[in-house]
């Protein structure tokens, strides 16, 4: 019998009701300011981060290998046989690679790591759909096969009032940011 766990990172935008219903494990990013550090969605809210951006742009750091390993140890202790990890774009974070490295240490748990090539709501929608499929009794292989099709149906657009924060936060390069600002 398959016991499937869902895991994501705190870049995922998903409501607490869905997290609770499908027992989704969320591994937090670190939010780093010059003189302080917070655990995303534990010590600091998204609203607080946005409010603080007026005075300082934080850096972020992916969930640590230790955090991922700890989550896997708990899943192993709870007799999970499979993990579906839906994570932030590998182009924005090393989370995908960290999951790959750690998951290989846990041979008793078959893992599928999905690089959303996106973030936020995209991760959340895919996880909710996976939760529904698990609840319906679908097998791991079937769910994993369905994920890329789920993603094809999702299209998101981000509109920035300014590229300043993306540039200062290190998400786009100085030259790209400057060119983008000039085109604005």
Predicted region positions:
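Mixed-charge interfacial surface used for oligomerization/domain docking
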Residues: 2-5, 11-19, 24-25, 29-30, ...
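N-terminal glycine-rich anion-binding loop in soluble enzyme alpha/beta folds
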Residues: 4-63, 67
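Glycine/small-residue-rich loop that forms an oxyanion/phosphate-binding "nest" at active or ligand-binding sites
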Residues: 85
């Amino acid at each position: 019998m398959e016991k499937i766990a869902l895991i994501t990172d705190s870049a995922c935008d998903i409501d607490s009701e869905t997290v609770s219903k499908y027992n989704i494990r969320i591994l937090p990013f670190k939010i780093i300011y010059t003189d302080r550090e917070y655990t995303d969605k534990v010590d600091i809210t998204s609203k607080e981060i946005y409010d603080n951006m007026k005075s300082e742009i934080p850096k972020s750091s992916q969930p640590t290998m230790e955090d991922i390993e700890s989550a896997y140890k708990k899943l192993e202790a709870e007799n999970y046989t499979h993990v579906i990890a839906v994570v932030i774009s590998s182009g924005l974070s090393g989370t995908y690679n960290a999951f790959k490295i750690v998951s290989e240490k846990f041979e008793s748990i078959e893992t599928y790591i999905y690089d959303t090539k996106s973030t936020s709501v995209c991760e959340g929608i895919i996880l909710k759909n996976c939760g529904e499929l698990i609840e319906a009794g679908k097998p791991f292989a079937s769910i994993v096969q369905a994920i890329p099709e789920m993603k094809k149906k999702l299209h998101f657009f981000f509109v920035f009032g300014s590229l300043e924060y993306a540039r200062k936060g290190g998400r786009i390069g100085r030259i790209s940011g400057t060119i983008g600002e000039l085109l604005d």
